[in-house]
Amino acid sequence: VKFDLRIVRSVALLAAASLAVSAPASDKKNQAKAAPAQAVDSGSFGIFLKGARVATETFSIQQEANSSVIKSQLKQTAGSDPVSQKSDLEMTASGELIRYEWSQSSGGSLTVFPNNEFLLEKITTASSSKPAEQPFLMPSSSAILDNNFFVHREVLVWRYLAAACKPEGGALKCQQDPGDFGVLVPQDRTSMHVRMELVGKEKIAVRGTDRELMRLNLKGDDFDWALWVDEQDHFKLMRVAIPADNTVVVRD
């Protein structure tokens, strides 16, 4: 499967050192020091349950000199007392975790960060100011895939494609072999393995318009999702389908 090289920039920004234009290490170091923060992606996703919009996720992804920062805010659009959540994910240029933070308007927060050879999660509940701690025997290269934040799925797609795709003859050649990832779900205080696989191009309706997008499947022990990204626009996530939950997520 081949795709336009125009998408390489976004793939490279978060996890694709192998796809970056080759240069001497000293030159890259100097360029990294001088590079200003760059907006990689921003926007919002509408989250629909049985066809009704129930929440909106607003997000931004910034590439800085030596790190990437992914910020997201989730706001419920239904209910008399809607709850909002926000998350901040910071990673190194090679995709290793620096820090993850989550909080919600009704109280409660958590942080995750590397601690020696494992990850440490600190959880503060609305009823207690003293945080509980939970270690995970996982490397800092593990992906964060928290509940309700679909931008985390976009970052995982880029990470998968960074490993699966290589420049060849002016195009990007992608293997369709599945990729396995160890991920942490901070709100659930659990870790798991997930598998992502490139399916290929499909025509699908997005906001009433037929689009040709690239489909990937994301699977775990108890879930099976379909994700569609736009190869013409830096592999940005456009749609997610979660059939078991009657849920669809669409970029606004």
State where each predicted segment sits:
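Bacterial N-terminal signal peptides that target proteins for export
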Residues: 1-11
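Helix-centric, low-specificity signal for extended rod-like, repetitive segments
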Residues: 2, 21-22, 146
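Bacterial N-terminal signal peptides
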Residues: 10-20
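Acidic, serine/threonine-rich low-complexity disordered tracts
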Residues: 25-126, 131, 162-252
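Acidic/charged, solvent-exposed loop-and-adjacent secondary-structure segments enriched in E/D, K/R, S/T
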Residues: 123-149
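Beta-strand/loop-rich accessory regions of lumenal/periplasmic or secreted enzymes
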Residues: 139-177
